[in-house]
Amino acid sequence: MGSHRRTVITASTREIEVLTAGNPDGYPWLWIPGSPSAAADYPRLDDLATRLGLRIMTWSRPGYGDSSPRAMPAHGPRISDDIPDIETILDAEGVEEEFIVVGWSGGGPRALACAAMLPERCKAAATLASLAPFDAEGLDWMAGMGPGNVADFAAALEGPEAYGAFKETYFLPMTDASVDDVAAGLAMLLTPSDDVTHSLGLARWLTEMTHRAGVQGEIGARDDGLALVAPWGFDVTSIAVPVAIWAGGQDATVPLAHGKWLAANVPTAVPHLLEDAGHITLINDLEDVLRELLEIK
């Protein structure tokens, strides 16, 4: 039914860029894409939401797209810092009672934060290829990741200044790259099952998200990555909301071990550990993901 882009204002007067699509009167679905990314139109999601009677809400996290950066907290960025922004978005969109949430890749920890910190409103959550907490007990966090991701997270562990310089060097050149260039760059992080060139629409969407993620420079990508390797600000073992954990055995970006750890440590987990799935191909299961959430909420 088409998308609508708007700006909402936080209590601290920051601006948040919000994108909605699907059925405007449908059940609220919060969609949280990966890192780095910004709110971008994807007709496939719009069509899916319309068909399932859902209203999609997504946003550009601080420093991405047209969303104001967040001042660097003394403790550094944390995943839990996004919850007040999510509450602001829900209030602005008139979502007073309940919603479901799906987080993909770097969006997965935010979906888990919704389940942990907004249990009265978040009725069910799903993660697609989500990272586990960096301090996850018993998990070799970087084992099995592609070399690009290992280098990225290693730089994040060096702190904001070093990581900002890393992102300026390696991320910003991608923000004006062509669809073909983005697909080629992703290929270094992905496995054969994740070949994005088979779907021009998907590659265009990923390219637009990447372009818009860098319109303010590297600050959004820097803070996003720092939050992933810092304490998240909540305990996944305290979650009481149903959470579907989707992860793929062919994922070289977020290895299957992360999904297995979440499935074993989120008390309400409903595991979907797919040996043949990759990081990108889990998007193909999104209809099944949403139908399950609507059943278990």
Label the model's feature ranges.
Residues 268-297:
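Catalytic active-site module of serine/aspartate enzymes centered on a nucleophile-bearing elbow/loop
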Residues 81-99:
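Conserved acidic catalytic loop of the alpha/beta-hydrolase fold
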Residues 34-47:
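The serine-hydrolase catalytic nucleophile loop
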Residues 49-69:
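Conserved alpha/beta-hydrolase
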Residues 145-234:
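Alpha/beta-hydrolase
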Residues 98-141:
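Conserved hydrolase catalytic core segment
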Residues 239, 245-247, 251:
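Short beta-strand/loop motif that positions the catalytic acidic residue
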Residues 42, 62-79:
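Glycine-rich "HGGG/HGxG" loop immediately N-terminal to the catalytic nucleophile
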